From Swiss-Prot:
Function: Component of the acetyl coenzyme A carboxylase (ACC) complex. Biotin carboxylase (BC) catalyzes the carboxylation of biotin on its carrier protein (BCCP) and then the CO(2) group is transferred by the transcarboxylase to acetyl-CoA to form malonyl-CoA.
Ranges of residues in domain CoA carboxyltransferase N-terminal: 28-295
Cofactor(s) needed by this chain: Zn(2+)
A GO MF label: carboxyl- or carbamoyltransferase activity
Major enzyme class: transferase
Annotated TM spans: none
Subunit structure: Acetyl-CoA carboxylase is a heterohexamer composed of biotin carboxyl carrier protein (AccB), biotin carboxylase (AccC) and two subunits each of ACCase subunit alpha (AccA) and ACCase subunit beta (AccD).
Pfam families assigned: Carboxyl_trans, Zn_ribbon_ACC
Native species: Xanthomonas campestris pv. campestris (strain ATCC 33913 / DSM 3586 / NCPPB 528 / LMG 568 / P 25)
Gene name of this polypeptide: accD
Main location (coarse class): cytoplasm
Family statement: Belongs to the AccD/PCCB family.
Catalytic activity as recorded in UniProt: N(6)-carboxybiotinyl-L-lysyl-[protein] + acetyl-CoA = N(6)-biotinyl-L-lysyl-[protein] + malonyl-CoA
Protein name in the entry: Acetyl-coenzyme A carboxylase carboxyl transferase subunit beta
Region annotation (Disordered) ranges: 1-20
Length: 295
């Protein structure tokens, strides 16, 4: 350091005086993947991960989704939380399945890709499940199927509606036939609900594909989708490569499916709680629920 630098006040910088780096906390700002706007993290979280500039629905964690659904002043009970995946087949591709499980559990903070809970929605009992895409792309393995089936059984015991928010890449290939069996298992669980006359509402979010879309995700008494969600069995690129034709614009998006009768409604995530409360009240022939938010 030169004699001039020693005499210079610390608040004055020159080209040769390095500026102190100001660290920005991780996650404080996020960029909208649709319009590119810089979004303040806490405000985006409060808006349920929906861009306030263009209304683009970004990914949201399963627990945040369920917390936004249930009444805040009522307790919730997680269903089959103790269940965790097991590498029965000792599957290995580029990495061992057991290692993938541990890595996903560490990065996501969840034991598997589906969270199921029992709680209250505007004063009425409800069972709901939500996929966490952060865990291995929301893929469906044995634990996902078992948690879904147990959640349906709880709804059957309580005598209340069942809601599932899907966000999945499909069946988990590392579990082979054990994963494919969950398609039949979950569908059978919904059959028991149907026999009891209890409603099942399926909410399809971005993306809902593969074995999940080919089973319980499309079996709702009412199928609701979030705006511009990708919904289908195979992805559009795979289909184009197979049929060697250009697909229509917006193919497999929720708006396209609504126009062609594949789903019943499209609902903004911020309105989803009120919409589900309205539908379940009507389907259960319950008195108009007390608005827990206003209480």
């Amino acid at each position: 350091m030169s004699w001039l630098s020693k005499l210079m006040p610390s608040g004055i910088r020159t080209e040769n005086t390095p500026a102190k780096k100001r660290s920005v906390p991780e996650g404080l700002w996020e960029k909208c993947s649709n319009c590119g706007s810089a979004l303040y993290g806490p405000e985006l979280e409060e808006n349920l991960e929906v861009c306030p500039k263009c209304d683009h629905h970004m990914a949201i964690r399963a627990r945040a989704r369920l917390a936004a659904l249930f009444d805040l002043d009522s307790p919730t009970t997680e269903i089959a939380a103790q269940l965790g995946p097991v590498d029965v087949l000792k599957f290995k591709d580029q990495k061992k399945y057991g290692e993938r499980i541990k890595a996903s559990q560490k990065s996501s903070g969840e034991y598997d890709a589906l969270i199921a809970m029992r709680g209250m929605l505007k004063g009425n009992p409800l069972v709901a499940a939500a996929f966490d895409f952060a865990f291995m792309g929301g893929s469906m393995g044995s634990v996902v199927g078992e948690r879904f089936a147990r959640a349906a059984e709880v709804a059957l015991e309580v005598g209340c509606p069942f809601v599932c928010f899907s966000a999945s890449g499909g069946a988990r290939m590392q579990e082979g036939l054990f994963s494919l069996m969950q398609m039949a298992k979950t569908s059978a669980a919904l059959g028991r609900l149907r026999e009891a006359g209890l409603p099942y509402i399926s909410v399809l979010t971005h993306p809902t594909t593969g074995g999940v879309s080919a089973s319980f995700a499309m079996l709702g008494d009412i199928n609701i989708a979030e705006p511009h969600a990708l919904i289908g069995f195979a992805g559009p690129r795979v289909i184009e490569q197979t049929v060697r034709e250009t697909l229509p614009e917006g193919f497999q998006r929720s708006e396209f499916l609504l126009d062609h009768g594949a789903i019943d409604q499209i609902c903004d995530r911020r309105d989803m709680r009120d919409r589900i409360a309205e539908l379940t009240t009507m389907m259960m022939r319950q008195p108009h629920p007390q608005d827990a938010d206003a209480a």
